[in-house]
C-alpha cells in the first residue's frame, strides 16, 4: 500500500448536497440552544472543568487510554504520587484543551504554532510534526494496514500550512461552518501530522473551531462520546472519503454528531444547574459560611480539597478545613483519605457525571 495523496483545500466536490442542507438547521438549532443554556451557569470554569474532564476521559478512551472517573478526579487533586499513567494522559488533555481555548480567545485565530503547542501539552514532548517515515494506521483487530498518511516532512508541512489558511480564511470555501468543521477534521486526521495523539488533537481542533466561528462561547460541545458510540462508522466514513470521495456521508455523520451531542449536553447542563440550585438552597439555609464562591468550588471540583477552598475563597487553611468537615459531617460531601491528606467528594455531581458516560 502506498501513501494516499492528499489534495489541498478547498474541497473540489459538492459538499452542500440536498441531504446536507436539510440536516444543517437541526444541528444549528441545537448548537444555538446549547450556547444559551451554557451561559446560564454563573461561573464558566464549572462547565470547562466538569465537561472538559468528561471529554478528556472520552477522547482518550477512543485511543484506548482508559481511566475511571475516580482516578480522573483524584488526578485533579494534583497529588502526583497517586496518579496513574492513564490519568496523567487524561489530565494532559484537559490542560491542552484549556490552553487552546486561552490561545484562540486571545488571538481569534487557530494557527499551526498553536496546534503544535496543544500537541506538546498533550504528549508532554516537543517532537512536533513528523519528520521520519513509517507511520501507518492499522486495523486493531487484524493488524492489517488500512491507511498510510503522507510520509515526506515537507509534504506534511505544506499540507498543514494549507489547512491553517483554510481554518483562518473564510473566503477559501463558501460553505456553512459546520461543513467546514467536518472537512477540517477529515483533513487533519488524514494528514496525521504527529507521531502520536492525532485523534485527540483533532477533536480539540473541532471544539476550538466552533468557538472561532462564534457557534459556542465555551468549550462545551464535545463529540468524543458520540464517536465512541459510533467508532466503526467514524473510521469507515473517514476511509470512504479517501477511497470513494463519499463526502456527503461523512458530513452527515458529523452533523448528526453535533446535533445529538448538543442535545445531550443541554440536558446534562440543565441537571448540573438543578443540582447547583438544590445545593445553594441547602447551604444558604443551613450554614452561615455559605457563599457563591464556596458553591462554585464544590461544582468546579467534583473532588475538592482544603487547598482549593483556600484559593477560591481566600480563607485560612483552618477555616477551609472546618467548612469541608462540617459539610462532610452533614453528608453534603463525602470525606476520603488519600496518603496523608483528605479530599471531599460532591457525590451527587459525581454520580451525575459518571452515569452520563455509561448511557448506551
Where would I find each of the regions flagged by the language model?
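FIC/Doc superfamily catalytic core
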Residues: 1-360
Amino acid at each position: 500500500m502506498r501513501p494516499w495523496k492528499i489534495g489541498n483545500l478547498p474541497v473540489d466536490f459538492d459538499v452542500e448536497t440536498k441531504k446536507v442542507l436539510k440536516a444543517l438547521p437541526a444541528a444549528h438549532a441545537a448548537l444555538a440552544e446549547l450556547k444559551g443554556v451554557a451561559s446560564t451557569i454563573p461561573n464558566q470554569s464549572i462547565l470547562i472543568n466538569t465537561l472538559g474532564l468528561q471529554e478528556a476521559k472520552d477522547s482518550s478512551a477512543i485511543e484506548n487510554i482508559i481511566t475511571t472517573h475516580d482516578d480522573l478526579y483524584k488526578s485533579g487533586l494534583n497529588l502526583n504520587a497517586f496518579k496513574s499513567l492513564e490519568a496523567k494522559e487524561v489530565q494532559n488533555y484537559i490542560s491542552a484543551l484549556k490552553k487552546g481555548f486561552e490561545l484562540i480567545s486571545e488571538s481569534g485565530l487557530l494557527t499551526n504554532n498553536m496546534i503544535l503547542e496543544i500537541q506538546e501539552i498533550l504528549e508532554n514532548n516537543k517532537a512536533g510534526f513528523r519528520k521520519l517515515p513509517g507511520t501507518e494506521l492499522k486495523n486493531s483487530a487484524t493488524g492489517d494496514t488500512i491507511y498510510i498518511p503522507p510520509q515526506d516532512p515537507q509534504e506534511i508541512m505544506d499540507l498543514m500550512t494549507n489547512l491553517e489558511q483554510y481554518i483562518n480564511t473564510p473566503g477559501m470555501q463558501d460553505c456553512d461552518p459546520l461543513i467546514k468543521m467536518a472537512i477540517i477534521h477529515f483533513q487533519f486526521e488524514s494528514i496525521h501530522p504527529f507521531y502520536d495523539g492525532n485523534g485527540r488533537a483533532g477533536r480539540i481542533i473541532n471544539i476550538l473551531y466552533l468557538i472561532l466561528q462564534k457557534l459556542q462561547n465555551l468549550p462545551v460541545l464535545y463529540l468524543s462520546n458520540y464517536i465512541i458510540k459510533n467508532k466503526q462508522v467514524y473510521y469507515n466514513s473517514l476511509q470512504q472519503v479517501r477511497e470513494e470521495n463519499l463526502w456527503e456521508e461523512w458530513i452527515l455523520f458529523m452533523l448528526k454528531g453535533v446535533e445529538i451531542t448538543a442535545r445531550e449536553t443541554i440536558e446534562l447542563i440543565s441537571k448540573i444547574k438543578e443540582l447547583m440550585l438544590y445545593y445553594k438552597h441547602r447551604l444558604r439555609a443551613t450554614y452561615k459560611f455559605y457563599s457563591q464562591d464556596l458553591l462554585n468550588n464544590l461544582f468546579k471540583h467534583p473532588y475538592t480539597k482544603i487547598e482549593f477552598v483556600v484559593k477560591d475563597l481566600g480563607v485560612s487553611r483552618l477555616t477551609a478545613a472546618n467548612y469541608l468537615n462540617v459539610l462532610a459531617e452533614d453528608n453534603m460531601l463525602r470525606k476520603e483519605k488519600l496518603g496523608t491528606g483528605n479530599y471531599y467528594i460532591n457525590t451527587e455531581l459525581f454520580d451525575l457525571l459518571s452515569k452520563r458516560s455509561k448511557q448506551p
